[in-house]
């Protein structure tokens, strides 16, 4: 189930870069913010407010019975019938969401070696979790194995709603941030993100259309990003050592 990545529109990439500036600026100021991947759900977003206009106009889930919805089910059933042991094992390894799913591409000891960058990723992850949960509740799309319990057999059980995938959107955001700091690793980072997203479909816990909202990383441009000294300091350090 290999699919090519969608190229980043240049204008959106510029907007995303400006938001990264504010990410690092605030992250360096506050190192105690909890991460949803380690300390439970956040009570509020970190950089965003959650009230940005884009969330109110975000495209909704595919309608039940629509062409996309029917195609989703057919893809899910086809993959379920053909998934091999390697694919199943990969899906099980990627089952639990963590920033490490992406940072391991750079270094398995990333948090220790690059603590300032890890702060940025952790705080961005708070926003990703908060906004993704909000959109999931609005759309209330049932998981494939919940919507079609007699047809879809998941590799493991998952709670909450299906659209959009938190694994796909969260790791996409992490990869886009890291690609700015480690440009030579961009292809490897994006391949890893696609692998994680595909594993969610292999596991039967997401439809394909749930895992392709590469929109999330671009929306951080909504946040003001005038204070950028800290990010500039971090982004210039890969030539020597990011710490």
Name each model feature, range by range:
Residues 167-171, 206-241:
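Alpha-helical transmembrane segments that form the membrane-embedded catalytic/substrate-binding core
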Residues 191-194, 198, 234-243:
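Short, conserved aromatic-histidine micro-motifs
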């Amino acid at each position: 189930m290999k699919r090519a990545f969608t190229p980043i529109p240049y204008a959106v990439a510029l907007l995303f870069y400006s938001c990264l500036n504010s990410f690092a600026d605030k992250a360096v100021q506050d190192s105690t913010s909890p991460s949803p991947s380690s300390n439970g759900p956040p009570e509020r977003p970190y950089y965003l407010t959650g009230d940005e206009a884009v969330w109110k106009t975000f495209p909704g889930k595919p309608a039940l019975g629509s062409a996309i919805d029917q195609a989703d089910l057919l893809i899910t059933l086809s993959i379920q019938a053909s998934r091999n042991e390697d694919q199943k094992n990969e899906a099980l390894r990627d089952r639990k969401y963590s920033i490490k799913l992406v940072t391991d591409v750079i270094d398995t000891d990333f948090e220790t070696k690059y603590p300032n960058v890890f702060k940025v990723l952790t705080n961005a992850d708070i926003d990703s979790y908060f906004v993704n949960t909000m959109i999931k509740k609005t759309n209330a799309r049932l998981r494939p194995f919940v919507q079609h319990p007699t047809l879809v057999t998941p590799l493991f059980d998952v709670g909450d709603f299906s659209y959009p995938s938190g694994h796909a959107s969260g790791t996409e955001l992490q990869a886009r941030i890291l690609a700015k700091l480690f440009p030579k690793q961009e292809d490897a980072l994006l391949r890893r993100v696609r692998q994680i997203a595909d594993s969610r479909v292999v596991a039967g816990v997401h439809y394909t259309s749930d895992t392709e909202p590469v929109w999330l990383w671009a929306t951080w441009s909504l946040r003001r990003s005038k204070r950028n000294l800290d990010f500039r300091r971090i982004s210039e350090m890969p030539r020597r050592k990011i710490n």
